[in-house]
Amino acid sequence: CGVYETAPGDLLLIPDGVPPPAGDAVPAVDTHASGRPSAQLREWAQQRSAGLEIPVIALEAYAYAARVAEVENPKCHIAWTTLAGIGQVESHHGTYRGARLAPNGDVSPPIRGVRLDGSGGTLRIVDTEEAVTDGDGVTRAMGPMQFIPETWRLYGVDAHNDGRVSPDNIDDAALAAAGYLCWRGKDLGTPRGWITA
């Protein structure tokens, strides 16, 4: 374990193994490729998918997002393993409750979290957009990376060039998660940077 002082008198305990290992190196990609750019990593993902128990489409999305982050924010050091860990915890890589990943990365049916209405230990998060609520202003986390609608509006991106920015697409969601975690120059290659991200 490591102990870091975040402010005078405030200590942050960081367990061993943080940040997690970066995993296998990801091949270089053309971040401006047309179509679904993450598909450039098909062979790499197919070689690892079964052993990692991560669908090929999801693994492509995580690795591509980490590669784009490396280009756009080289000091962030986000690894595809971090994105894969989030994807596993939040939605079993887009397969929670029988959802499936389409070849273009869309998750169907859409994955929604519990109502964030303040009950059962949840925060109460109100949103005025009817499309992301049940009509009562209370929201749910969305998609394979479980974005809160307000966060999605700030960080959502079209990672696979279809003209849509969708939290229900694993490519869009993985790249948005990388952008969110790398925000404000965070360095996820350090224990403190990773734990505070």
PLM feature segments, named:
Residues 1-52:
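N-terminal low-complexity, Pro/Thr-rich disordered segments
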Residues 34, 41-197:
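Catalytic glycan-binding domains that act on GlcNAc-containing polysaccharides
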